[in-house]
Amino acid sequence: MMRSWVSLILAAGLVACHTEMMKVTELKAIPDAAYAKGVSAPFCGVVGDALVVAGGANFPDKSLLDGGAKRVYADIWAQADGEWVHAGVLPDSTAYGATFAVDGALVLAGGNVCGTTTDKVYELTFRDRAAVLRALPPLPVPMEQCGWTRDGDRLYLVGGVGTTGVYACTVGEYVWTKLADLPEPLVQPVAFASAGKLYVWGGFNPETLEVSDKGLVIPTDSSVIPSEAKESPWAEAPAIPDGGTFVGATGATLPDGRLVVVGGVNRAIFARALHNTPEDRIPYLSKEPAEYQFRQAVYAFDPAAGAWTLLGSDPACALAGPGVAVRPQGGLYVAGGELKPGVRSPRIFSLAW
């Protein structure tokens, strides 16, 4: 969630009527004292057959409720054959960035470094089980808590803290150009690109404090469209299922072309919390995790059908800011995330259906 007080608290679309059988399989946690309390908003992806979790943030010493300080990490952990290896460190301690899986590597873009939004981008590969990092061209503007997605050889970054920009680059070149501006500022949206269209769902407006349940779509072959254009290039997309939001959720594109979204806050509870006063802080942070009603349901969006499908629901998925990556064997990995404001989960598990 965001670092300020706003961050501490942080039209239903078409939904297919059937539910697929979802299986949750527990995996080994990262064997490190700093990660024992879990992290949220890490870089997370798969290189070869190895799950990679890097960076992330938590409150290791004292809880947020007790005035604890957030710590951001630089560690790079890789799991292959069921065992975790400390594979190296990031150039900076980073959380809230974007992760792209690209041809035997991960591209790590933006994030928050020591309280400052960064424009840095790195390629992460492995040599003899050790992480190798190569600096790529920086982003046009610093970005964190943005939406991100890949479609073919194109990567997209959408919104986040301090920008309404939508940016794209080509894999291998990594020179980012601006496609358009969002209709409004959106922090923590979920993005998805398919068949020449870029979709954006959820997010919250840090200026109006409104929490979006809407979907937006724009052609990805558009030239740059100024924000002051008389006609918006954005059209409505099928809204978020159940009238909720995807603030705090993480999306991943499956090999079959569907978007799967895991986690996220409860829209109504989060919207009320955005208006909390300092006097509300202790009562709000003192609640049990279940009282925040983070989303347990996992949904998939099929761009061909233009509809959402409920894949399943499990309390393990009630997380904000989890790392999510596509498993080579099918399904997803889910790593860490927030159980409630300031409290992380150390669990790492897979989802299959």
Where is each model-derived feature located?
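C-terminal motif of bacterial Sec signal peptides marking the signal peptidase cleavage site
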Residues: 15-16
